[in-house]
Every structure is written in C-alpha cells, then in structure tokens.
Regions:
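Single-pass transmembrane signal-anchor helices and their membrane-water interface zones
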Residues: 33-44, 55-82
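Disordered, charged N-terminal biogenesis/targeting segments of membrane/secreted proteins
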Residues: 1-49
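Beta-sheet-rich non-transmembrane sensory/scaffold domains
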Residues: 33-37, 77-664
Length: 664
C-alpha cells in the first residue's frame, strides 16, 4: 500500500510540474484569478455547511481551466466524478477544454454513432488541441489504475435507482441479507456477500476471495476454500449468482510492461484493462474458472440482471494517437478494436474519454454478447431496470449548468442507443434521477435554485418546477413510485415531498424544516423514510454528531420527523458515499452502518420501535483491524457478521453479544 501511494504521489507531482511549465504563458480568465477564487472560498466558508471536498474541486478546476481537460478528468476520476456547483455553477471539467468558450450542445434527440474511425479521431483530436496537455492522458490512466487498486471496490455509481427495497431476503432455507442496491431487481457487485450458507469475502490483498463456513451460527467460523487470481489482477468487486452457482470477480488487470518486447501492440496502447472472471462454484470446495472477458480502461462499475453481467470501465485517450492506427484511440473488447458503429458520439463536438460497456452471459463467460462505448468528457450513470442513463454536466454562461443525458437500453445482453436529451442544472448523485413507467424524473440544482423535471421515454421534457429552495443545494434524494423526496441544505434545511402522480403537473406537497441534514435516504416500508446524516447547531452550523431520523411519510403533504437519534461521539458515516455499506431491512427491523469516532471506526446496529417511536441501539462496537476496503454488515438468520478486511466478527442480532470471530 505504501509503495502504491508513493507511486501515485510521484505521478501526480510529475503531472502538476508539467502543467505548471505549460501554463506559464496561459492567460487566466478573470473569474479564476486568485483574488476571485479567494472570494469564492470565503463565500463558501460563510455558509453553514460546506462539504470539504468542494474546496479541492475549486482548486482542481482552476488547474484544469488553465491547463486543460485531461488534468480535470484526472481530478474527477479520484473524486468519484462529483459534480460541484462551486465552479462556474457546475462541473468545471466539462468546460475546461477551452476556458473562454461555452460548448454548443446539440438539440438532436438521436444519439449519433460514428461512421468511421476518422470521425472518432477528429472528436478526440479537437479536445486534445484545446487542452494542450493531452500527452499526459496516458499517465492519468496508469496512475488511476494504481489508485483504484489501492482503494475499495467502487460503488459507483456511486450512489446511485428506485428502490430502497429491504437488504434482506427470506427463503425456505432461512433469511439472509443481500447487497444494498440502487435499483430493485438489478444486482451490484460488492466486497462481501452471502448465499445464506457461506460468506464470500475479498481479502485485503485484493487478489483473493475467501469462502467462509459460518459454523454453528457464528460460533465456529472457518475458512472453507478460496479463489486466488494472478498478481496482474486487482479484484474490485464480485457477484455470487445462486441460481447458476457462479461467482464472477470483476477486476482491474494490468498488462505487461511496455519495455517487454514480447508484448502485443494492443497491450502497448491498453496498459490497464477491466476483466470479468467467472468461476463455477457448484463444488464449493473446488471452484473452477470457466471464462474471462476484458475491455479497455479502469473499472468503473457493473450490474447483473437476468443472468447477464454489464461491465463499465473508463478509458482515457492518450496524446500519442496515430490517425491510421485506431488501436491508439479506440477501446478494445477481448483484445479487438470496437467497431465504429458501437461508439456513441457526444452531444458536444469533442470528447476525451470513453465509458466502455460490455455485456456477458455468465453461462458463456468467455465472450461478450454486445458492447457500446460512450465518447464523452467524463460523467456518471444511473442504471434502471431497463435502461442505462449516462449524464454529464456542461457549464454555460451566467453560472448556469446543463446536464446532458444519453439513454442506452439493455435486455438479455443486447445494448441499443435510444435517445439523448438535456435538462437545466446538475445532479447531486444518481439517487437524484429515477425511471418510472417509462418517464425519467430528475431533481437538479442550477446556480442558486433547484428544479424538478420530468422527461418522457425519448427524453423530451414533459414538465418542470423551477425556483425551488433559492440559495440552497440538494444533498440527498429518493423516489418511490409516484412520490419523490429531496433534502436541501444551506441556511435552512427542509425535506421536500413531491407528488409525481401526474407527469404533466408535478406538485410540491410539503416542506419540513429540520435541524441538521440527511445525506442518505432509504425507504423503511411503505410509510417510513430513514435518513442518515448529521446533526448541526442551528446557529453556528457546527456538527453535533451523526443523526439518524425516521420520517413518517404516510401523508406526503404532511411529512413528520417521527423520531431522531443523535450519536454525538461519531463525526461521520460511510452512508453518503458508499450506500452498499448500509444494512436497512424493515422486515427484519434492523439498521446497520459504520461511523467514525476519535478511536477509529464503530459499527452500529439499531432497531426501530414503531410503537414507542424511537430507535433502540443493539450494538455499538469498535471495529477491529485497519482496512481501507470499507466495512460490511451481513446477516444470516439471527447472526450479524461485521466484516473488516480479513477480520470477521459474529454478533447476536437480538442482544448484540459477540459469538465468534476469525482472521482470514
């Protein structure tokens, strides 16, 4: 880990040194001169709550506008592609290609696919000519790979679909928890899973998945078998498909060094790949590798639905492109260049990277079913039960932001470009948009206002509500069927409830003002909404600890804060940026998450007493070990397994009493 961090820091400093030299003669726009940036930061300090990473984004954006798109994309990649309103009203990275030019966004509703490799080359070259430092894109790719290898499995998506279904499942053989996913019916990879009998855990070395027998309800935990990949692999996440008895490891895969003369030409241009490696686990003692697929770029995210894996990676183009060698600027899937017809061109006239999408039938795991690549300048995605929405924020004049969307349908592995569109404002995260009955509902922030927008299946605007919560910004959101909820925070902190039953006439039903704010929302049955966030002093804005809230949403026009629990010894949780870390099961009536205290990380397990309208603490235990992977709480029957890297600890879910543990 230390060596990886040193390498990352060296690469970052090298890139910054090059930027400094190349930007010495670059004229800086007035809005980004130091005195104006100081004013911007001072303005932010005066607000009651300012997310710490936003200051970093302001600085990163300044560098990007002076030096070019590539470095901003580097910053976006390591910040989880968070769109910030604090630089020119939106995602500075999207406007960095030419600091004095606002890019024209196409009004076409049709996604254009490339007619030739030459056309693709021109799009990328245009961006690189604007950026002035495209030669460092290759370094960005390689450095990103090192950092991703050292990080936890990404969610990425970040946060990010309708759902909030319980994180548990009941079968004839018993009950057990499942990964907390964004969209009901669409599975996501994780670093720990269970099939109700065994635990599957990625070790800290990121190359091994242990299969663990929990023994007598956690009193006799034993390692049963393992799957270990080669040193060129870094396991990001994995899936366990109980129907087909398959385990699929989604990995980052590093190619041989460029100096290796035996290396192929395609490997030279694609140093980092994303791989899906599938194992047959019918004999749990002896898993058998069945197949592998690869695609260009660093791992971004993945989904699994109906036995098909959908793999997403980010491939950044290098500055050493050769026009008549598409391999130097076109992604590869299973070692072959993607066809030009599979590449979706952006709604603006330039692009610096691809979101590469491949589908795999896990019953035939050595080949892909279909693939697409979305040429862009960096964005995020939301995956519904039928469609993939890829969105980017584009800076416009007068601190305005426009979010562009591209819609790709998926069904049984087949991918189809459907439509593109745009809306005012930027999205806080992927919980801020949702597909329902063919329509797409979005909550966005644009400069100092917030909006509700509804688009039809062709991404044409049906309706919108504007000028909401002036001077505030959206912190969290959630949709359930014909209703939506979002929390804003700035000087006041309301929870808005929205009636979406008539797509042509959405209505704001209520606005509940509450102290503090919820950074993560999760439906707890049909009439309750769970919020995990922070309690703050209403006058000073100083944090007073982690706040757990249960909202009564029985009457959407009169939402009530039914109960609140403040954990004043915790100063934050993982819920806001890693929703997979949350256990929320209304059927089991258990809420689990990890938080941070002065002594390290603490795992909390709560239950909610609906009759007395209060939270009750079952477990609040300091987590052993020191892992960078993230903490997971998984239950089988009535035993909770808290997993921290190579350490598993078992607790009784009713009493909180420890039952056993193991170090893998």
């Amino acid at each position: 880990m230390k060596r990886e961090n040193e390498h990352k820091e060296y690469c970052e400093q090298d890139i910054l040194d090059q930027i400094s030299r190349m930007s010495e003669d670059t004229e800086v726009p007035d809005s980004l001169r130091s005195e104006n940036i100081d004013k911007l930061l001072e303005k932010k300090k005066q607000k009651k709550h300012f997310r710490p990473y936003q200051i970093g984004l302001v600085a990163a954006a300044c560098v990007a506008v002076v030096a070019g798109t590539v470095v901003w994309q580097y910053g976006r990649m390591h910040e989880g592609a968070i769109n910030s309103p604090d630089v020119s009203g939106g995602n500075a990275g999207s406007s960095a290609g030419n600091s004095n030019t606002v890019k024209k966004i196409s009004d076409s509703k049709k996604i254009r696919t490339a007619q030739s490799y030459d056309e693709i080359y021109k799009y990328i070259k245009r961006s690189q000519d604007n950026s002035g430092i495209a030669m460092y894109a290759r370094s960005v790719n390689e450095t990103a790979a090192v950092e991703d290898s050292a990080s936890t499995g990404r969610s990425t998506a970040s946060s990010t679909e309708t759902a909030s279904a319980d994180t548990g499942v009941a079968t004839a053989d018993g009950s057990y928890s499942q990964t907390n996913v964004r969209q009901s019916g669409v599975d996501e990879g994780d670093i720990a899973k269970t099939d109700g009998t065994y635990l599957y855990v990625r070790e800290d070395n990121d190359r091994t998945i242990d299969i663990v027998d929990v023994g007598n309800s956690g009193t006799n935990i034993e390692k049963y078998s393992e799957i270990t990949l080669g040193k060129e692999y870094t396991i990001q996440e994995f899936y366990v498909n109980t129907d087909q008895k398959k385990l699929v490891a989604v990995c980052q895969k590093e190619c041989a060094d460029k100096s290796n003369k035996k290396q192929t030409n395609t490997d030279t241009w694609n140093q980092t790949k994303t791989a899906a490696v599938t194992y047959d686990i019918r004999d749990i003692k002896k898993p058998v590798k069945e197949g592998e697929v690869t695609q260009s770029g660093t791992y971004n995210s993945s989904r699994m639905a109906d036995g098909y894996l959908y793999l997403f990676s980010e491939y950044y183009t290098g500055g050493d492109m050769v026009k008549d060698k598409p391999v130097t600027y076109v992604p590869l899937v299973n070692g072959k260049e993607m066809s030009q017809a599979s590449i979706c061109l952006p709604p603006v006239n330039c692009g610096t990277m691809y979101e590469v999408i491949s589908s795999v039938d896990i019953s035939k795991p050595d080949k892909t079913v279909d693939n697409k690549a979305i040429l862009s300048e960096g964005g995020q995605m939301y995956v519904s039960g039928k469609n993939i929405y890829y969105y980017e924020s584009e800076w416009q004049q007068d601190n305005q932001t426009v979010t562009t969307l591209r819609k790709i349908s998926y069904r049984k592995g087949k991918l189809k470009a459907v439509a593109q569109g745009k809306v005012k404002g930027y999205l806080n995260d992927t919980f801020s948009l949702d597909e329902y009955k063919g329509n797409l509902r979005l909550f966005t922030t644009n400069d100092d206002e917030n909006l509700v927008t509804i688009l039809d299946k062709k991404l044409d605007k049906i309706s919108s509500i504007e000028n909401l919560a002036k001077g505030e910004s959206i912190y969290s959101a959630r949709f359930m069927k014909e209703a939506g909820y979002f929390v804003t925070y700035e000087q006041v902190d309301p929870l808005f409830s929205v009636d979406l039953s008539n797509p042509e006439k959405p209505k704001i039903l209520g606005k509940l003002k509450i102290p503090g704010f919820s950074e993560y929302l999760h439906f707890y049955g049909e009439d309750k909404l769970l919020g995990i966030g922070m309690s703050t002093d209403e006058e000073s804005g100083v944090s007073e600890g982690v706040k757990i809230t249960m909202f009564d949403i029985t009457d959407r026009a009169d939402v009530k804060e039914e109960s609140t629990l403040v954990l004043d010894d915790l100063y934050g949780t993982n819920a806001a940026y890693d929703y997979k870390s949350v256990l929320a099961d209304q059927q089991k009536n258990r809420i689990g998450f990890s938080g941070y205290s002065q002594n390290g990380e603490t795992y909390c397990l709560l239950t909610y007493n609906g009759k007395e309208k209060k939270f009750e603490t079952i477990l609040k235990e300091e987590i052993n070990g020191n892992t960078s992977q993230g903490i997971r709480g998984i239950y089988i029957e009535d035993t909770l397994y808290v997993i921290s890297g190579n350490i598993i600890e078992a607790y009784d879910m009713d009493t909180g009493k420890k039952k056993g543990d193991i170090i893998l």
